[in-house]
Amino acid sequence: MLRSFLLIVATVSLFGQCKPLPLATSPVSDAVRAPHRSTHETRFLRTNDEERGATMTLAGVLRDKAQTKQLLTSWLNSGKSVPSVSNKLGLKRMSLEQAIHHENWKALTTFQRMKSKKAKAYAKYGTGYQTEAKTKENLLQWVMRGDSPKEVSSTLGLLGLSRRKIIDHQNYEAFRTFLKYRKQWAEMQGNGFTKLTT
């Protein structure tokens, strides 16, 4: 064992003292190592005012990213279908090949993603629509952190609404689940289940 260790130490120290061998000096390798010189200082892939998000043209008017998002969200909240939005964007009667190259294609695909996300949504709060699994995970965190029903109803957008509006609200089931979890947590604590034993 000691011999192996000494052999490794000797090998490492030998390699540490060696100088690196120079690369072959062929015209090709010199060209590869030579710094690139060009008349341009930098290469810009986009201009500063170029649009980066989904934009669309509606009724002959070009909409910027913010306007596009606002319109798509409005259509989503009013329950518009993908075919009706496709028709509004002028893509309905086109072949798939034509539609893909149309200026409103990105807006339509964005709307489809928004629609799909909303369909899978259990509640809407925070950054937007949340899945059932994510919502229940957050509800458990809030219960264990000791958040009050008032705090959670505020987070879910239910605070200050009438009873009728709360019952009709899309986050009502999430709030009921929070109350159920809270009750179960209190029962567990009352039974000493959550106390650590050493």
Curated annotation (Swiss-Prot):
Secreted effector that promotes P.infestans colonization of plant host. Specifically suppresses Avr4/Cf4- and AvrPto/Pto-triggered cell death. Targets the potato MAP3Kbeta2 kinase, a positive regulator of cell death associated with plant immunity, and perturbs signaling pathways triggered by MAP3Kbeta2. This is Secreted RxLR effector protein PITG_22926. Induction: Expression is up-regulated during the early plant infection stages. Belongs to the RxLR effector family. It is found in: Secreted; Host nucleus; Host nucleus, Host nucleolus. A motif (RxLR-dEER) lies at residues 43-52. One of its GO terms (cellular component) is host cell nucleolus. The RxLR-dEER motif acts to carry the protein into the host cell cytoplasm through binding to cell surface phosphatidylinositol-3-phosphate. Residues 1-20 form the signal peptide. Keywords: Host nucleus, Secreted, Signal, Virulence.
